[in-house]
């Protein structure tokens, strides 16, 4: 697709959002982050959370006008599915990772950018209660982008191409 004035700003917003997410991640990698309190009394935790929130807003903004407005709500529903399934698996001590199911579903339906927004929204909302989750923002972004790009290439068109990878993924030790 050729870049024109209408699409260039969308790409710029996505790149800036990913850069902000990586900057927030680098802040969590610092040795200082492990010693600070993981509530919002720490400036470092609060600034990481604000950077990730701003990145999520930029991802949503990049899709405004490109998709119907109701589709912009999909990442919020996907994030709620992620948080619900993640808390259920943690409480039931099931050794499976179900906290990215919503991200994968939204990425398949709405594309990689909204899949990335779902992963980032999950991190931002989960970071309110567990600030350690903020360090895993790149994981949600990567999963949303990878699954969305695979869906665009038609990887999920056949049932057999879904069942085998899902069974391998679900049987992975936690």
Task: List the predicted regions and their residue ranges.
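Loop-helix junctions at membrane interfaces
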Residues: 1-174
């Amino acid at each position: 697709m050729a870049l024109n004035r209408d699409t260039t700003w969308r790409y710029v917003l996505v790149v800036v959002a990913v850069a902000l997410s990586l900057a927030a991640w680098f802040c969590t990698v610092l040795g200082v982050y492990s010693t600070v309190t993981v509530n919002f009394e720490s400036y470092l935790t609060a600034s990481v959370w604000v950077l990730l929130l701003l990145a999520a807003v930029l991802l949503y903004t990049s899709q405004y006008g490109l998709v119907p407005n109701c589709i912009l709500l999909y990442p919020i529903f996907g994030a709620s599915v992620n948080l619900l399934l993640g808390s259920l698996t943690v409480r039931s001590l099931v050794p499976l990772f179900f906290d990215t199911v919503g991200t994968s579903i939204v990425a398949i339906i709405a594309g990689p950018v909204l899949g990335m927004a779902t992963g980032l929204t999950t991190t931002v909302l989960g970071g309110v209660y567990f600030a350690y989750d903020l360090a895993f923002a790149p994981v949600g972004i990567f999963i949303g982008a990878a699954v969305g790009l695979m869906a665009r290439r038609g990887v999920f068109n056949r049932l057999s191409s879904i069942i085998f990878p899902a069974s391998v993924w679900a049987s992975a030790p936690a």
